[in-house]
């Protein structure tokens, strides 16, 4: 999002979310459920787990290094699918009867040696766990973090509302309030901005899989009144707000029967809804030595603390890494003209208050715990309903004092 966004008197921005029963999200959740199982067995496990699904089938592939022991992957897959809500063959997909194929093997030793001992300290002899420099980045790449003061969770409003709608759909389905809903669904919200501030919701789109015998009129009424109006603040809705509910007119065939799914295909849904840049790396199925995940979490942590400290109203950070190297290659910041102190000062304060080496990120955010399955639906950021330590603003006060604010 450029600085022109802050200068425009009228601008529209749209973000989407998907429900936990979307085929791509099934795969993300399976990959993270498998990851959590390995981390429960061995907190230092190295995991790269990918999942694909189509009609009647889930395939789990990847590379894993861990202390030997039995991990019941097929059982984990079926339980995850059942928890999502695919419990009846009439939905087009059933946890008990779908096929499950597993093809997982060991991590490449060439990659492992770079992660195990970072380039700066690699050599003969044992390196202790306490030396954070011993963990090098698991791959090259750049990661972004973002925060803004549009919402209490310091997230962009369009993606925040889209996620709230998705969670509400899931809750009403699972509680039996709207029993005709099925697990697959999508939401999309368009917000009107004026000079960088949200002023109203222009359009809300909801598509949700449903039973064949329910009418479109009932679906539209229930979704507008029990879902949209329940989560969108009334002051943001006016007589010009537009609603689209299942605009194709019918959404009976859904889930993996309607579309194939794959881990890592909803990276914008997972992050900031397109409001911020993205380095391209997906999160789910990756242990925290993979900086695609851990560094993106750290960048969100930094950005949220900068905004919570009042150093800027909108803030984006980029961090870049080389495989096997612990220290970031570069760190850059962008405040979109909203900063209260210079960007140079903010960058200096970040370097003083945050250690962005992979080992330090894992240590400070306690990332070797099995906390990832809940992140795999409804966004990794802006969450107060799950264990997400990168959402803490524990360094905001120190940043504020150091900046003289």
From Swiss-Prot:
Cellular component terms, GO, for this chain's entry?
Answer: cytoplasm
Q: Which HAMAP family does this one have?
A: S_AdoMet_synth1
Root EC class: transferase
- Name the positions where Mg(2+) binds: 24
**Known CDD domains for this protein?**
S-AdoMet_synt
Please give the function described in this protein's UniProt entry: Catalyzes the formation of S-adenosylmethionine (AdoMet) from methionine and ATP. The overall synthetic reaction is composed of two sequential steps, AdoMet formation and the subsequent tripolyphosphate hydrolysis which occurs prior to release of AdoMet from the enzyme.
Instruction: Read off the Gene3D superfamilies from this record.
Output: 3.30.300.10
Q: Where in the cell is it found?
A: Cytoplasm
Which Enzyme Commission number(s) are listed? 2.5.1.6
State the name under which the record lists this protein: S-adenosylmethionine synthase
Underlying gene = metK
């Amino acid at each position: 999002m450029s600085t022109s966004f802050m200068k425009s008197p009228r601008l529209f921005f749209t973000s989407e979310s998907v429900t936990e029963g979307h085929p791509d999200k099934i795969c993300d959740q399976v990959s993270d459920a498998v990851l959590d199982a390995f981390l429960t067995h061995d907190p230092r496990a190295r995991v790269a787990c990918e999942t694909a699904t189509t009609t009647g089938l889930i395939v789990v592939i990847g590379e894993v290094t861990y202390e030997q022991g039995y991990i019941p992957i097929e059982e984990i897959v079926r339980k995850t699918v059942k928890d999502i809500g695919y419990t009846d063959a009439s939905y087009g997909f059933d946890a008990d009867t779908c096929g499950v194929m597993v093809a997982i093997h060991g991590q490449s030793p060439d990659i492992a040696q770079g992660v195990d001992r970072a380039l700066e300290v690699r050599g003969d002899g044992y390196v202790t766990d306490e030396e954070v420099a011993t963990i090098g980045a698991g791959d090259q790449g750049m990661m972004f973090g973002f925060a803004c003061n549009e919402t209490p969770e310091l997230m962009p409003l369009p993606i925040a509302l889209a996620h709230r709608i998705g969670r509400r759909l899931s809750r009403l389905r699972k509680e039996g309030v709207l029993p005709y809903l099925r697990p697959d669904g999508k939401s999309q919200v368009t917000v009107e901005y004026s000079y960088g501030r949200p002023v109203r919701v222009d359009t809300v789109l909801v598509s949700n899989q449903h039973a064949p015998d329910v009418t479109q009129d009932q679906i539209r009424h229930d979704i507008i009144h029990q879902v949209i109006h329940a989560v969108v603040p009334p002051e943001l809705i006016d007589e010009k707000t537009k609603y689209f509910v299942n605009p194709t007119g019918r959404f009976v065939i859904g889930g993996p029967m309607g579309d194939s799914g794959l881990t890592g295909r909803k990276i914008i849904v997972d992050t900031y809804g397109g409001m911020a840049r993205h380095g391209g790396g997906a999160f789910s199925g990756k242990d925290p030595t993979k900086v695609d995940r851990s560094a993106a979490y750290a960048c969100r942590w930094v950005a949220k603390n900068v905004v919570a400290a009042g150093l800027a109203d909108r803030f984006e950070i980029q961090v870049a890494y080389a495989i096997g190297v612990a220290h970031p290659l570069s760190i850059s910041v962008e405040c979109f003209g909203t900063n209260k102190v210079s960007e140079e000062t903010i960058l200096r304060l970040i370097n003083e208050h945050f250690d962005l080496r992979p080992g330090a990120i894992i240590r400070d955010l306690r990332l070797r715990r099995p906390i990832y399955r809940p992140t795999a639906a409804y966004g990794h950021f802006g969450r107060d309903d799950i264990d997400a330590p990168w959402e803490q603003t524990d360094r905001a006060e120190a940043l504020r004092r150091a900046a003289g604010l």
